[in-house]
């Protein structure tokens, strides 16, 4: 089937922002202007098209990144039709993983900032993720109609806080109540949108006299930024003192795709102004799948291979999201990097080396769907019928295996025990949790061996609350939830050498394993490392993997309180064996015994997760908030002034002290402060805390 849209006219973009910067509203407007939505859905009354899980509508925050397709020809209808795949990303810090997984499959992103709040803590996290995956981006300053709106302040904050290089291509005309439209610095015209047509109609006017000077100054900066794209443009600029519209766009596009600059726009999505110009900027400055380097991966011989964004290449795609749908069961969202996928075809899951048949292929418009027969290179779609695939795995042509770069998911930092309210729901709860864990790799489920309880783990209290809520809504299982538990770890402070001997010789075939190991602290974050330093075959080669395995099986249960052991290096340097009685199991046992004994002598310590906490509070309550953080063993690391008499406090606080913080903060500040927190690192717990934790586990 011929392409309806050439691949050069595809744009796979994410819309990303801090909570309440107006991201979902912005997406809604995009769907409206691109002709998909007839009535605009407002988040205020819980009707936004993109926020499609019932919970999102109640809480007014976006949790799952729904992928939506729409078309755009430019607000002047001056472009050939382009196809946008928009991935909506959540802004809440407990869902950072969702942002990460969408960044992995995007070609470009629109960063939405609030004209009043500016660059907020979560914006910094999202920016870091976009930088990590080298995603070109635009910035859109939203809510220009709100009191306290200041476009230029956000430009400065982007430079200071994000170390970004924003290049405004429009300037606001007026602000707050007086916000009318924008000055287009490329055309040097004012764009005024018509309110009666909900922004569908607009007109170009002359730039208001009072803005002419500013417009010329900012235009010069923009043209200079464009000219730096290459020597030809720079020479032309130096000769003529200006560049043509086309050359400006070419220069800005080149540098945006190289992640050197970020074109910056502004508007108010709620009042239907400015989003239309941003859509044009997506076409002008963000890359199509062929403008970015071919995707890299490894083949079945671990050799690096690349795939170009071309229908003629062999098929390769990344499964970036799983969702359970009430009508069709499990949906697997895929980004196709190369080749073509047809419904009914068999594909290879190269990570698990399993073949699967694709049932139907759907393209989503938020939660409405259209069935399609094939999905082409550069496109995003949802597949039905894949049983074994989990997030981050590669699907490819069985004749040309490739494994694309995997996504790295963080380990959970908080656990709670859950049990169904009625015994009969035990099995149903197991199925529900299994489904939810397949959808979200930062959520884990396990059964505690000692107590038999079901333990769920996640990235924060809100994360787990939402999981429990979804069990009730989607699977009809009500659960009782225990008190949250912290994921402590154990480590060591000094290096020791230790012998381990496992000998059983009582008639018949015996057991004999004997090792000497050196246990020492490893660099933070390095995890477990095994070094084989055996000389002269004192431990035969075939038993060395058994020693490694014996050590690894001992790691989950430390000697202090049974928490997992991290950041240790173990060197096997000596030992002995018996011709008849030695076997793998004996060496596994010997290694395990040596490790436990060594651990006791190596000054074991307890590590606790530390959270980066950012509180925004009115100045009047600052003393209370800081006192409370200190009482939670928090270390305040910095303070900033925010607009409107607000203060921002950055602190590092142990997770163990943060339970129930939301409620406490509300009562300390009469509900006027907000906070966000994300996992930072593990650090040694003070002696008194460690002793209390250890005695509770005994």
Curated annotation (Swiss-Prot):
GO terms for molecular function: GTP binding; GTPase activity; guanosine tetraphosphate binding; translation elongation factor activity. The keyword Nucleotide-binding applies. Signal peptide: none annotated. The keyword Nucleus does not apply. GO terms for biological process: ribosome disassembly. InterPro entries: EFG_II, EFG_III, EFG_III/V, EFG_IV, EFG_V, EFG_V-like, EFTu-like_2, G_TR_CS. Keywords: Cytoplasm, Elongation factor, GTP-binding, Nucleotide-binding, Protein biosynthesis. It holds the Pfam family GTP_EFTU. It is found in: Cytoplasm. GO terms for cellular component: cytoplasm. It comes from the Bacteria. GTP binds at residues 17-24, 88-92, 142-145. HAMAP family: EF_G_EF_2_B. NCBIfam families: EF-G, PRK12740.1-5, small_GTP. Belongs to the TRAFAC class translation factor GTPase superfamily. Classic translation factor GTPase family. EF-G/EF-2 subfamily. This is Elongation factor G. It comes from Azoarcus sp. (strain BH72). The gene is fusA.
